[in-house]
Structure formats: C-alpha cells, structure tokens
Design a protein with these regions (language model features):
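Positively charged, small/polar-rich N-terminal and surface patches that mediate targeting and assembly
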Residues: 1-88
Length: 88
C-alpha cells in the first residue's frame, strides 16, 4: 500500500477530488499554506494500492492548472510506503 501526499492550489482541490473519487480513490483534504509564497494550498492524502499510483498521479496532472507564477508548480507529490493500514 502507498500513501500519496499531494500539495495543490486551493483552486484545483474540488476538481481533483471529484476526479479521484469518480475512480474510487479515497481522498482526505487538509487546508495548508506554503512557506515561500504563503498562498492557499490543499494537501490531499490518498491511500491506494501500488498498482494504482500511476493513475492517481495522472489524474493530478490532468486536473491541476499551471500557476501564473513561474516559480510555482502545479503540484508537489510524495509517494510513501505504508507499513500498516488499519480501519477501526
């Protein structure tokens, strides 16, 4: 199992979340602020099987907009191993 941590612009959150959930990804959204430009961000937590990671990243690429500032990225994405997953 993998955990995808995606930091995206606030304006893209609803669109990205909708597309991910349409393909049965479970998404948790946390409001966050970047330290450099201090503008609105959302951090998405997406738990998924390793085989589905490429599709999740593809959805992120397709549904995020290029920021006006050339120093910004559409998204910052981390993919980390999940040692244990428990649902209570």
């Amino acid at each position: 199992m993998k955990l995808i941590i995606a930091i995206i612009n606030d304006q893209d959150t609803e669109n990205v979340s909708d597309h991910l959930t349409q393909e049965s990804f479970r998404v948790t959204c946390i409001a966050s602020t970047g330290s450099f430009l201090r503008s609105g961000r959302s951090t998405l937590l997406i738990g998924t099987d390793e085989i589905r990671v490429p599709r999740a990243i593809e959805i992120l690429r397709e549904n995020t907009n290029q920021p006006k500032d050339p120093n910004e990225h559409k998204a910052i994405v981390f993919v980390v191993d999940v040692k244990e997953f428990i649902q209570v």
